[in-house]
Every structure is written in C-alpha cells, then in structure tokens.
Amino acid sequence: MTTSHILGFPRVGAKRELKFAQERYWRKELAEQDLLDLAKALREKNWKHQAAANADFVAVGDFTFYDHILDLQVATGAIPARFGFDSQNLTLDQYFQLARGNKDQFAIEMTKWFDTNYHYLVPEFQKSTAFKANPAHYVNQIREAKALGLNFKPVIVGPLTFLWLGKEKGEAFNRFDLLNQLVPVYVEILNALVAEGAEWIQIDEPALALDLPAEWVEAYKSVYTELSKVNAKLLLATYFGSVAEHAELLKALPVAGLHLDLVRAPEQLAAFEDYSKVLSAGVIEGRNIWRANLNKVLDVLEPLKAKLGERLWIAPSCSLLHTPFDLEVEVQLKEKNTALYSWLSFTLQKVEELNVLKQALNNGRASVQAALDASQVAADARATSKEIHRPEVAERLANLPKGADQRKSPFAERIVKQNAWLNLPLLPTTNIGSFPQTTEIRHARASFKKGELSLADYEAAMKKEIEYVVRRQEELDLDVLVHGEAERNDMVEYFGELLDGFAFTKFGWVQSYGSRCVKPPVIYGDVTRPEPMTVRWSQYAQSLTNRVMKGMLTGPVTILQWSFVRNDIPRSTVCKQIGVALSDEVLDLEAAGIKVIQIDEPAIREGLPLKRADWDAYLQWAGEAFRLSSMGVQDDTQIHTHMCYSEFNDILPAIAALDADVITIETSRSDMELLTAFADFKYPNDIGPGVYDIHSPRVPTATEVEHLLRKALNVIPKERLWVNPDCGLKTRGWTETIDQLKVMVDVTKKLRAELA
C-alpha cells in the first residue's frame, strides 16, 4: 500500500487565531497559559485534519510560536550569547525577545526562507558556540499527538541546512567547523524522539537544492552515518529544487527514505527511479494554490508504484506552511467567480487531493472516478478560459519599441535636472512609505468594505489620516514626505484589487514571519490597469504641503513574488505585463505633478533561482520588467526603489542596472553588512541604507544611528547618501514611530553640520 504524509502544516490557524493571541499576549492582554492552551488546540485541529485526510502520519514539531529555525536554535543551545539567556530554561517572554528584540538587544536578524515569502531568524554562530540539546519543543508535541492516539512523524531541519542558514559572528572562523560539535547534539535530540516512540523522523535538508560547496556536500556522508545510528527510520526531505546532481550521494546515504520535490523539479525523478529505499514523491504543490490535474499526476505515479511497490510514499512538494488554510470558507469568491474557485486548492483541499491519489494508487482509479473527473473538468476549463487570455495584452508586450525599458538620459544628466528643482539639503531624509495603520484606519476600511461606511465618509477618514501623517512629517522636519498609505491594506493586495487579471480571497492568509501574515492576491489572467490607482491620494497629500511628496507604487517583481501566480505561462511574461500596466500609473502621477515616485522592489532578490546558473536569465527579465514600469518618464522625474530583507552583494551589477535614481535598502539589522560590497562596486546612483530596524518597537539610540550613518559615509559619497528607516512603518505604533524618526532626523542634522 502507498503511504501518504504531510511535511508540515500552517501554524497560525484557519482564522489567524495564533496571530491575534500572540499580539494580545505581547500587549499583556492575554495570560501565558491562555496562549499555550490556544496553541495546543490549534495543533490538535491541524493533526485531526491530517488524520481525516487519511495521512499515515501527522507531522509533529512543525508548529512554532514564531519560527521553526528559532525553535531549533533553542533546541540545540545555539541562541545568541549576547542576550544572556539560558536556552535550557528559556521563558516564553525570552523566546519572543530573541525574535523581537528588547531594550538592551536588537532582534535576531531575519531573512527569506530560501526563495519563499516566509522569513526565518538567522542563527548567530560564534567560534565559542557550545551546543546543548534541549528537545522539549519536539517531545512535548509528540506527547500531545500520542495522547490523541495519532501516528506521528517528528519534523526537524537537519544539521547541515541549519548551519548553512546561519552566520558567523565575532571572531573570524568558518561555521562549518562547528559541525562535529553539532551532530552529537542532534543525535541526543533524535534519541529523545525515539524514546517517545518515534519510528520515522523527517529531517529536512532543503540546502541540498542550493549550490553548496563541495566540503558541505561531502559532509552529508559522515553526518548521516552518525544520525542513522539512532534507532529510528530517517526520511531525508529535500524541496524547493532539484537534487539530481547529488543523486549518487543521496542514494548511498544510510537513511530509510528520501523525499523529492517533483513539482518544482519533476525532471529529477529520472535520477532516482532506481532508489532502493522509501521514495517520497512530492506531487501536490505546497507553495501555490492551483488545483492539481490528478490524472496527470497519476500518470507519473502509477509507473513509479509499479517499480517501487510499498516503497512509494506520496506527499505535498514541501510544507503546506506556504498555502492558505481552507478554500471552502471563500464563499464570496465562489459566488463572484465560480470558475476561478474551481481551479483552486488550499491546505485542506491539498491533503484531500493527496488522499484521492492514495486511494487511486491503492485501489485503482475507478475507486475515485468522480474526484478524478472533477479534477479533469477544472483543468480543461482553465486551459480554455477566455477570462484568462486577453489578446490585446500580448499584443502590447510584443509591440513595445526597442529600448522601451531605458531612461531618456544617463543618471549623471538626470540627477542634475532633478537636483535643480528638488533643492534638498545634504543627507536628505525620507520615509520608505507606510505610516502606522491604526485601529481607526483598519476599522474605517473594514466598515467601508462591509458597506457600513459611505464612500464619502471613508475618503474623508483617509484624507484626515493623510493630513495627520503630513503634519507629523513636517514637525519632524523630514525632507521628502510620503502620504502614509492609510488607504492601503497591503502593499501588494491594494494594487491587485485595482488591476485586471487579479482575484482576492477573504481568508487566504499565509505566515510571513512571527505573527505577521499576508494575504497574497491571485494572478489568474492577463494583467491591465483599467484606471488610475494612487494619483488622487498623492495629489491630495501634495496639496497639503510645500515639501516634496513622493508617490508610492509596488513594483512588478514584488507584486509577482508576493502573489499566487498563474502557472500556465512563464513568470517572466506575467511580470512584464505588470510592469507595463504600472507604467501607465507612473505617467499619470508625473502628469499630476508628483515627480518623485518610488517603485518598491523589496522582493527582487527573493525571486533569484536557488541555482546560480539560472540567475542571469531571471535578473534580465526582472530588471526589464522594473524598467518598463517607469518607461517614458522625463529626466527630471526622480525614480526611487526600495529593497528589504535583501542580501544582494552578489547581484549589485543587476541592482545598478535597474537604473533607479535612488535606492533605499534594509541594512540596520545586519549592521550595514551590505555596504561592504560598495567598497569594490561603486554603486553609481543615490542610495539610502536603513539606519534603524522597523521590525522592532525599540527606539534606537542616537549613538547607534550615528554609528550606522558614519559606516555608510565611509563607502558612499555624502552627496549621494539618503537617510531613512529600513522599511515602511505600517506595523509600528505612533509613539515609537515619532521617537524613532526624531532620533534619525536629529543625528542627520548633527552630521550635516559636521560635513558642511
């Protein structure tokens, strides 16, 4: 019989119960025990959903209060020494301080989990790091699953991926040298799981889909030789890309099974068809929301079943952390667009799709014929829908003039024209875009969407908020102002609602980091902009002040990366469609007198393929799509872009090729680490490295901000340096926002006087 299993499940709950409970706990409105009880109830629900879908094991250990890599830092005793906490006796408050910072320490750095929109907390390894096992996180969840009478499979990220994802801190050394100390701690943790009755243990090694150095790849042999001495069967899970280049190594490892992502890399199956142990086929897309064509999947699985017999397992391609919880609650979407609804599949539907595949493999297709027929009808309808394909969009792309994505003049000429009218001081200050989204703003938006607030009253509320934001910025003496984005629920969703080819869910939330969830738009058809989206808000904000007002758009690559994207045409084509649609908005802003326009691209690095060999092709089309979004603007219009969570030292030429007049970047959490590359690569345009971390409520000291600004001045000419926070301020409160910005402006004025 074929075994089915799940690699991981969403943590936040069907209605974001965990998020709201966490935030109440942080505000001291919820007792710790109440938070613990809610989390336990969520885990039980998750496991029961998996069991109801006939999964042979439920995944345990994947649930986390903030991040699974932070949990692993605690479990291995590798929490940052600078906090002074005891990992063996860590309180829940201390756990959250690691993630969010406290008055004495900034938060652990956060970055993208491979090429997804989930963020993990980056382990800080020191030469003196002393690992110590604390398996309580996993053991406690196993005990809960056992109490419910469930078959369970613990899930833990493997030692090589864990080390790879970290960074060296302090005295220079290679974190790879810590491996021999880390492995015995893993053995101790695994033994604790075995003592609780674990028969199979899933060890995730997604780093195998990267370009790992030879010594790291070679280390898999010795590491898994040690881990395999544990009295349990190990399932080595890979995902997010192909591991075919390591096929011989993986086939020889002393593990009991191997999981392959056959959605991202279906071609890799050929390299493993002679695998002699359990082969877990990841055939249901774990990162997107499209319904599978189950007949096509069975066409792949049935020959595999004939070869492998009971050694064939089936699963989603990766953890379902990246998909929304349940399609069935999307009643409005079903009423509005029945066809689109029929093409979608969320977490609960995916586990059911897996169950249909399992039944078909074990009992024949006829046993699930109705489900297979429904899957086929949906696939056929999607392939031929006129709602998806709009000939005029393809025509416009095909007929773009040569050089449409290039500015009229080089930066050196443009900046002279821009400076002539901008008349800004040295080290100009600005904000990235958003200001705090207060309860009042959210209430007004929700009331308007429900029809409880008229359009006139809603717009009056937004204008009042915009005026408040403008006045606060004037009081702080900022140089280039923003309107604060009060009218925007989300930097991608807002634009998606106003572009054709997009659809929206009501409950399609996925975790971004900690308690932060996002609700990605669904790009299902060709993209156009039917009417202006932001012009009247920016125009109104500009009417309130004599200072320069910056227009704010989200760029094509970020809209693509932070959406659930159609999978029937290349992503590059979708991205260029968005870029061309945005160019209409940019020209309308310019015509309305908004001549500083920011096109945010925080996700540009996240889109990089995991294998370096594929980078150039991506960077070429991503850069073209970005430049298309401002095609046709005049030289004296200043185009800004913003990037965050990014380590892009290795793609600086591509960033420069975007040819934005000003780039602002997130750098404070990594102590301006990004700027080391500027010593070698003379970035040609203006740049604003973030001088404080907006992900934490902590107000930076003047000394800290000055330290970062001076580091920036060492590598960026003062004439080309801007001063700004790391990112937008949407998630912050007003009190800390004012205090943080005041420190930033005061330090800037001090340095201006010094440099004058």
UniProtKB/Swiss-Prot annotation:
Zn(2+) binds at residues 642, 644, 666, 727. Gene3D superfamilies: 3.20.20.210. GO terms for molecular function: 5-methyltetrahydropteroyltriglutamate-homocysteine S-methyltransferase activity; zinc ion binding. Pathway: Amino-acid biosynthesis; L-methionine biosynthesis via de novo pathway; L-methionine from L-homocysteine (MetE route): step 1/1. GO terms for biological process: methionine biosynthetic process; methylation. L-methionine binds at residues 432-434, 485, 600. The gene is metE. InterPro entries: Cbl-indep_Met_Synth_N, Cobalamin-indep_Met_synthase, Met_Synth_C/arc, UROD/MetE-like_sf. Keywords: Amino-acid biosynthesis, Metal-binding, Methionine biosynthesis, Methyltransferase, Repeat, Transferase, Zinc. NCBIfam families: met_syn_B12ind, PRK05222.1. PANTHER family: 5-METHYLTETRAHYDROPTEROYLTRIGLUTAMATE--HOMOCYSTEINE METHYLTRANSFERASE. Belongs to the vitamin-B12 independent methionine synthase family. Binds 1 zinc ion per subunit. Catalyzes the transfer of a methyl group from 5-methyltetrahydrofolate to homocysteine resulting in methionine formation. It catalyses: 5-methyltetrahydropteroyltri-L-glutamate + L-homocysteine = tetrahydropteroyltri-L-glutamate + L-methionine. The active site is at 695 (proton donor). Its EC number is 2.1.1.14. HAMAP family: Meth_synth. It comes from Haemophilus influenzae (strain ATCC 51907 / DSM 11121 / KW20 / Rd). SUPFAM superfamilies: UROD/MetE-like. 5-methyltetrahydropteroyltri-L-glutamate binds at residues 16-19, 112, 516-517, 562, 606. This is 5-methyltetrahydropteroyltriglutamate--homocysteine methyltransferase.
